[in-house]
Each structure stands twice: as structure tokens, then as C-alpha cells.
């Protein structure tokens, strides 16, 4: 993480975080973790969300909690998996809701959301790394301070962003967002445990595009999953 792979716009915004004492401690923790354990995603993908979606191009924010923790899944974008990897259950439910909401026929066989990121959808996990096979193993080590700062920077310096917050953890981040400047859509988490409690039928994808078009912005092509 000496030279993080991150878009220059975000590097400028997040420079105070990279230089903060907590981040030095986080780096030391990650070095020690990688000496003992396999960690995901690989180093070059840790900041992929910030690299794929420049600060001034963010139109939509989707928040996750932490990366997938099994081999080959995590590549730095929340909910997303590389092409050719089995689509995880939460993402299957996200695709089902898009198809229901928009009348699309996106197959449930691919889950790479890079095409969303390239259109201005920031796919941000609150914690950017994880130990293999141990969900949540890198929580409360400093990543949340870092990603909260990113959310706050967007909330304060930009206007008109659509924040799609699914589940109680993501919804807790609404405290950083001024709803007179931005749009906040909330629903239960798309996990199989909670999707039937209101994620299915939330119609966030059509709502998001309507909001963007009201602002004269291009809608997101949610079918761009590879």
C-alpha cells in the first residue's frame, strides 16, 4: 500500500486519511496479517472501488460491509465477483430485483459489476480487506474510519448522489448524508435471510435512474454485468 492503485481524484480527497496515524497502524496490521494468513482481495484490488469510479464521476453509491472471504471472489467492488466465478446469493437476489424492476433478463450466471463502476456507481465496502474464510476478520482495525471519510467527502463536496443503502449496517451510514443535497434509498439487505422482508420489490434501480434523469444525467445501464 506504499503506492495504492487508486484514481488521482480520490488520492487527493483521501490523502489526509493515508497520512493519519490510524492508517499507519492499519498498514502494520495488514502486513502482519499477510505474513500469517491469506487475505483478500489481492493488494492491487484493495482500492478498486476508488480506482474504477473517480470522485467527480460518482453518481450512485452502493455500500457493502466487507469483502467476500473465499478464494477467487473478492476483487475490490462490493457485491461483485470476477467473471467466471459463481454468483453469490446476495448478488443473485440483486439481479433478480433488477430483472423484476426493469423487465430485463440479466442471466444469473455472471457477477462482475465493473460495468456499473465505470458508469459512476461506487461499489464500496466499509472494510476493504478480510482474512480468508473469516468474515469480518478485519473489521474495527481502521478501514471504517477510512471509508466513512470517503462517504463524508462525497456528502459534503458533491450534490445529487443516489445512496442505495441495504440492511441496517449500510443504513447506519445515512447519518453522514444530508438529504437536502442527496438522495437516500433504503431497503433490507439482499441476503437470502432478509431479501423477502422488502428488498424484493424495493425498485431502487428504476427509482435511481428516474432521479438521475431528473437531474439531466444519463441513467445507469444495470444490465452491464459481465
Regions inferred by a protein language model and the residue ranges of each:
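C-terminal substrate-binding/active-site "lid" region of AdoMet-derived donor-dependent transferases
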Residues: 199
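Generic N-terminal amphipathic, Lys/Arg-enriched alpha-helix
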Residues: 2-14
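A polyanion-binding, active-site-adjacent surface
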Residues: 4, 16-165, 169-172, 177, ...
Amino acid at each position: 500500500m506504499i503506492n495504492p492503485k487508486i484514481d488521482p481524484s480520490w488520492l487527493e480527497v483521501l490523502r489526509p486519511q493515508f497520512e493519519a496515524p490510524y492508517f499507519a497502524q492499519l498498514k502494520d496490521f495488514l502486513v502482519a496479517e499477510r505474513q500469517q494468513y491469506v487475505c483478500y482481495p489481492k493488494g492491487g484490488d484493495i482500492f478498486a472501488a476508488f480506482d474504477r469510479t473517480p470522485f467527480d464521476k460518482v453518481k450512485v453509491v452502493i455500500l457493502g460491509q466487507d469483502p467476500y472471504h473465499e478464494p477467487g471472489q473478492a476483487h475490490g467492488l462490493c457485491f461483485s465477483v470476477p467473471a467466471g466465478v459463481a454468483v453469490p446469493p446476495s448478488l443473485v437476489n440483486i439481479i433478480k430485483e433488477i430483472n423484476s424492476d426493469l423487465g430485463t433478463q440479466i442471466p444469473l450466471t455472471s457477477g462482475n459489476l465493473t460495468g456499473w463502476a465505470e458508469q459512476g456507481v461506487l461499489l464500496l465496502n466499509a472494510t476493504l480487506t478480510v482474512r480468508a474464510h473469516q468474515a469480518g476478520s478485519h473489521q474495527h482495525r481502521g478501514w471504517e474510519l477510512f471509508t466513512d471519510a470517503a462517504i463524508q467527502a462525497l456528502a459534503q463536496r458533491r450534490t445529487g448522489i443516489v445512496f442505495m443503502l441495504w440492511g441496517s449496517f449500510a443504513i447506519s451510514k445515512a447519518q453522514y448524508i444530508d438529504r437536502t443535497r442527496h438522495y437516500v434509498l433504503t431497503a433490507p439487505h439482499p441476503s437470502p435471510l432478509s431479501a423477502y422482508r422488502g428488498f424484493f420489490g424495493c425498485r431502487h434501480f428504476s427509482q435511481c435512474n428516474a432521479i438521475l434523469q431528473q437531474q439531466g444525467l444519463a441513467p445507469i445501464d444495470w444490465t452491464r454485468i459481465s
